[in-house]
């Protein structure tokens, strides 16, 4: 059988692509080296932020607004356990923060619902938060967080119900191109398609070693908290920048545990074996202490944590482009630790590619040629 589309990597983007392409009537094969959702990539750990006023640059705003529409649609499949939780997101940092300046600019350009607070206003609204006098907060009322593993599980189930073929626990070992399309090699045999999407995440260089993607080991952890830090108490998700420039992110507490991670830093790695479990690097359990001690002093000890990986591009912007010399293969990689919130729209973009539809978005900033 020759498929219309083969998806290599069915985690965040691949699961979405499989669903949207199958729903569009294509004959699709989803593949993954493991059984998604799983612990081997960048999507585990239950939750991921979704921010609209984007500190990484306004080029992302049209994408994230479409992503939010798709998340809302997907959430209707799980109304008892919603995939998107509109907790709000407070972005904290020094008044001269470049990140916060980008957030404010994005909000102004796109007329987003963002409220600016000074230090006293932040601490009056959320007494659990402490910030210096020179800090400001930009509160995104309509943002929140996503249930990442539940989203992937839902997409995969919906795709399967729509007739999508799924080949999991079966790594792709090679990709071949010819005039007739794309062939992938696996331990289970060879499969052919008219087009392919490569969204293999951290280990995409195992298949395409020439790509400018660097895996980085990252950790996040859950710390002892109480009901004051919960969604029920209107405590928001957050990003926070310390005076030294370190960037943190976190979520409202659930079951008396608050999850937090450090966005910058981490350990450069070159193989899956180097991504050692949480606590095998001495600093893992204390990485969030500088933020907790200064901004959330009421949070208690580290309860548990997990390691994941970022697939960083050189400029930490996404790579969304066809494979050089092979216009029938789309790359979606280099998501650099801020990609999950876009998984829905990136999956839709992949499905449009498979149907020979022109994207509704300007993807020029994400081309591979910027690194040449």
Curated annotation (Swiss-Prot):
Record EC number: 1.5.3.-
Cofactor remark: Binds 1 FAD per subunit.
GO cellular component, one term: cytosol
In-chain residues carrying the UniProt-annotated modification S-8alpha-FAD cysteine: 308
Keyword Flavoprotein assigned: yes
Keyword Oxidoreductase set for record: yes
Key words, A-Z: FAD, Flavoprotein, Oxidoreductase
Enzyme class: oxidoreductase
Gene Ontology terms for molecular function: flavin adenine dinucleotide binding; N-methyl-L-amino-acid oxidase activity; sarcosine oxidase activity
Binding site for FAD: 4-34
Catalytic activity reported: N(alpha)-methyl-L-tryptophan + O2 + H2O = L-tryptophan + formaldehyde + H2O2
Function statement: Catalyzes the oxidative demethylation of N-methyl-L-tryptophan.
Protein family according to the UniProt entry: Belongs to the MSOX/MTOX family. MTOX subfamily.
Name of the featured protein: N-methyl-L-tryptophan oxidase
Lineage: Bacteria, Pseudomonadati, Pseudomonadota, Gammaproteobacteria, Enterobacterales
Gene name tied to this protein: solA
């Amino acid at each position: 059988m020759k498929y219309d589309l083969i998806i290599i990597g069915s985690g965040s983007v691949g699961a979405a692509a499989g669903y949207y392409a199958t729903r569009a009537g294509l004959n699709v094969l989803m593949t993954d080296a493991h059984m998604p959702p799983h612990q081997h990539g960048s999507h585990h750990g239950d939750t991921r932020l979704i921010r609209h006023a984007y500190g990484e640059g306004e080029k992302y705003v049209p994408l994230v607004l479409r992503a939010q529409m798709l998340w809302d649609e997907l959430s209707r499949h799980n109304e008892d356990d919603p995939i998107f939780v509109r907790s709000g997101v407070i972005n904290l940092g020094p008044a001269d923060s470049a990140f916060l300046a980008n957030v404010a600019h994005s909000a102004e350009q796109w007329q987003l619902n963002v409220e600016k607070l000074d230090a006293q206003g932040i601490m009056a609204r959320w007494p659990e938060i402490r910030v210096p006098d020179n800090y400001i907060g930009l509160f995104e009322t309509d943002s929140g967080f996503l249930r990442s593993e539940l989203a992937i599980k839902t997409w995969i189930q919906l795709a399967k119900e729509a007739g999508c073929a799924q080949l999991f626990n079966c790594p792709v070992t090679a990709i071949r191109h010819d005039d007739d399309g794309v062939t992938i090699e696996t331990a289970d045999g060879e499969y052919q398609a008219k087009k392919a999407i490569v969204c293999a995440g951290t280990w995409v260089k195992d298949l395409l070693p020439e790509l400018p993607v660097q895996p980085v080991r990252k950790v996040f952890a859950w710390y002892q908290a109480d009901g004051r830090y919960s969604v029920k108490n209107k405590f928001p998700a957050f990003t926070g920048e310390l005076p030294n420039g370190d960037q943190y992110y976190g979520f409202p507490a659930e079951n008396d545990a608050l999850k937090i991670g450090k966005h910058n830093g981490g350990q450069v790695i070159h193989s899956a074996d180097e991504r050692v479990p949480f606590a095998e690097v001495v600093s893992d359990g204390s990485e969030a202490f500088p933020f907790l001690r200064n901004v959330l002093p009421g949070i208690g000890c580290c309860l548990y944590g997990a390691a994941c990986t970022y697939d960083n591009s050189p400029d930490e912007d996404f790579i969304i482009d066809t494979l050089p010399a092979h216009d029938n293969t789309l790359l979606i990689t280099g998501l650099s630790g801020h990609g999950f919130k876009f998984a829905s729209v990136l999956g839709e973009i992949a499905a449009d590619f498979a149907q020979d539809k022109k994207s509704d978005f300007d993807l020029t900033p994400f081309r591979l040629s910027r690194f040449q």
